[in-house]
């Protein structure tokens, strides 16, 4: 079971989220049949979305778009406050060999571009916020977004580790944020600890990576666990939703589908589930328009 644990330092100067997103990213890889670099890039963006959504309340939905200029194309993810996230990468077939340290290259294949966050509070007026991609490694781009757009100094680490067959081995991450009222010496102490932290990939390799992340973040300082919540890859598509999408088409288009294709087939971009609509379905839609 994937989870996100929310914590705060006893002093109230900092808060931290730590995540195990292994099953989330594994499900995404299986559904989209992504190759190595596409898997890691999509996985990191899914984790970034889980972090951002955990910061929201109510029925808020949050869309993250990594709009890069290189071979991966766009990466789109959508998360909600109930722990659900879905997403896809425009080019799932980017398969670049690992570096000498075993890391999968991502940044060069994301390229330059924008990190776009759309926050939908359900009021009909979603809020858009855009920052430039500074590295294409996703974690650094998320930290820059939080610091620049939300004016909250943040440290982010997230990664996806693959096994020898390029299947998802483990995935997770952390977010540390300075809270209002933090003293200069507290900030300096935490900055030093973050700078001295082992690489996120090293922490994820630990037997209990959640505890390893918390230990690396807080050291010997006291902290409180505020909550532990389940997170998952879950798409909200349905036959009814795509039926409504078809209903928005002109009658002439529906008639053409009926006569030439004898139906319609739609595949959800986010989860690759295919929905079929027969001639009777199309007839019903055409009749409703008349």
From Swiss-Prot:
Keywords: Chaperone, Cytoplasm, Disulfide bond, Redox-active center, Zinc. One of its GO terms (biological process) is protein refolding. GO terms for molecular function: protein folding chaperone; unfolded protein binding. Under oxidizing conditions two disulfide bonds are formed involving the reactive cysteines. Under reducing conditions zinc is bound to the reactive cysteines and the protein is inactive. The keyword GTP-binding does not apply. InterPro entries: Heat_shock_Hsp33 (IPR000397), Heat_shock_Hsp33_C (IPR016154), Heat_shock_Hsp33_N (IPR016153). It holds the Pfam family HSP33. One of its GO terms (cellular component) is cytoplasm. Disulfide bonds join 235-237, 268-271. It is found in: Cytoplasm. Redox regulated molecular chaperone. Protects both thermally unfolding and oxidatively damaged proteins from irreversible aggregation. Plays an important role in the bacterial defense system toward oxidative stress. PANTHER family: 33 KDA CHAPERONIN. Belongs to the HSP33 family. This is 33 kDa chaperonin. It comes from Streptococcus pneumoniae (strain CGSP14).
């Amino acid at each position: 079971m994937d989870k996100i644990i929310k914590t705060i330092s006893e002093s109230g100067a900092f808060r931290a989220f730590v995540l195990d997103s292994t099953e989330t990213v594994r499900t995404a890889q299986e559904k989209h049949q992504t190759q190595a670099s596409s898997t890691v890039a999509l996985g990191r963006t899914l984790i970034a979305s889980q972090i951002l959504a955990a910061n929201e309340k109510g029925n808020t939905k949050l869309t993250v778009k990594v709009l890069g200029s290189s071979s991966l194309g766009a990466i789109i993810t959508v998360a909600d406050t109930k722990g659900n996230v879905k997403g896809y990468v425009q080019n799932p077939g980017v398969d670049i060999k690992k570096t000498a340290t075993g890391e999968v290259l991502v940044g060069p294949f994301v390229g330059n571009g924008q990190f776009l966050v759309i926050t939908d509070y359900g009021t009909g007026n979603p809020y858009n916020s855009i920052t430039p991609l500074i590295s294409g490694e996703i974690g650094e781009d998320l930290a820059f977004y939080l610091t620049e757009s939300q004016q909250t100094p943040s440290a982010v680490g997230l990664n996806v580790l693959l096994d020898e067959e390029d299947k998802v081995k483990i995935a997770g991450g952390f977010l540390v944020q300075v809270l209002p009222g933090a003293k200069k010496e507290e900030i300096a102490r935490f900055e030093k600890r973050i700078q001295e932290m082992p690489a996120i990939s090293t922490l994820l390799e630990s037997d209990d990576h959640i505890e390893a992340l918390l230990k690396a973040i807080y050291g010997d300082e006291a902290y409180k666990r505020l909550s532990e919540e389940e997170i998952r890859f879950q798409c909200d598509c349905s036959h009814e939703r795509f039926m409504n999408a078809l209903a928005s088409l002109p009658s002439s288009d529906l008639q053409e589908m009926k006569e030439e294709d004898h139906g319609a087939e739609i595949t959800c971009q986010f989860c690759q589930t295919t929905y079929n609509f027969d001639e009777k379905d199309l007839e019903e839609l055409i009749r409703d328009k008349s």
